[in-house]
């Protein structure tokens, strides 16, 4: 009976999602008519998504997936002196705390730093400290109650992440009834990597941490350095920055230093390979530029020793190709990056015209981690993109498109437990502004909204989630979804538009079947996530229902795509090599008549990483 109830709930849940997608479909003008509203005249060229931007989007999604799969940082703290074995609830009245020895009346409790210095400001609020000391003020205190006070003050700092900070007794004036407590802030004395101090390497000196010139990147990855207060969240952030590279699996042990209160941050990280390679093939490409696509990539991690990453990726189809190079380096809570993309395509328009385009993009990025806990991660990011697109029509040069775009946004990750499994939700949102500087094309003062703009304001947002559902017997089922889109009030150039269709938006269609200045999409998936492992191979069957709508400002009216189907993901690990693939069959439910009749599409990819 219980299994039947679970099955019924899953069916009702997926039926609700289907009704939501159906609602999107029915909003399409003429969706039930014989001839749906076309997105463009049949003779108009099909939208071509920049293959370089596709590669960049794939890398961002891969980064998001690695972040979701990132295990908690392994941090251990050696026992510190100054603690007690007392454990009395905070709300216990002082007079009820046993006091076997002599006592004295306390009229005032003063908290200071070492040597009478002012108390270091931390995330532990003054009101929290006052609440602890107020409970003891005006009472008789002996050694037992005094230890309780010190423990409670210490616990306030430890619970805030200052795991090596201790409250100790300072110089006393008992006769005046004043008790002085010194807050001995735990500080970082030094960093070590695999048992050796961090330093610039001499010629031919072997590296302890994998860098060729230095191991300074390990220390630079932490928000705090020698002499700073030691806080667990800062250590966690540093470990996460180090482990963002594929070759690293770092853990940290906080060891006592030479001076009381100081600690050595000992990093253990047997580094893996410096370089990784990827080869792949798929049939995700657009009909106009080539269905079959070949990909190759190389990634080099921490070559210099600054925890930097360098990657080079290439994608090629019969009528398009792109080369994308990326570099990123961390500095505490900051991560700076630069991406260079060079891509080109050509397509036949009608039967007489050949269109050729080439896009060169420079992207400068910055990310700042606002906060990190076991369950939440919050960050700010900004990117500046300079882009030039040159086009030809039958070997005649068209007006080049030059853009300078600044995007400022934020993202949030939340992990949670449900039905004895881990779920998550991610949110990414940003505001883009086209700038009139750096050689960008200037829009005319009287340019109509229907003309493509280089100076524009655009809002985009994407929320994605994984929700573990009740088990079906032994099978663990997860519902994965995503809702994304963008909005602007003026026409955009192709590189700034929203493309719908393909494995990253609406499955059952080829990449970028329709494009619009504004629109949205909804992805829904039910996946069996605990299929038994066979010979180190894993598979994941799933079924999906996706839909989305896009509109061009110059052509009023939304166009709709909707698809349904099923697929299978597979992964096999053999020593240091990994093989992965995916096969999917999708049926098109709704599509504009201008891009052809509805059809059933089979897509697949296979990749080899080593």
Residue ranges and their predicted role:
Residues 34, 133, 447-610:
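C-terminal transmembrane beta-barrel domains of outer membrane proteins
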Residues 15-26:
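Bacterial N-terminal signal peptides
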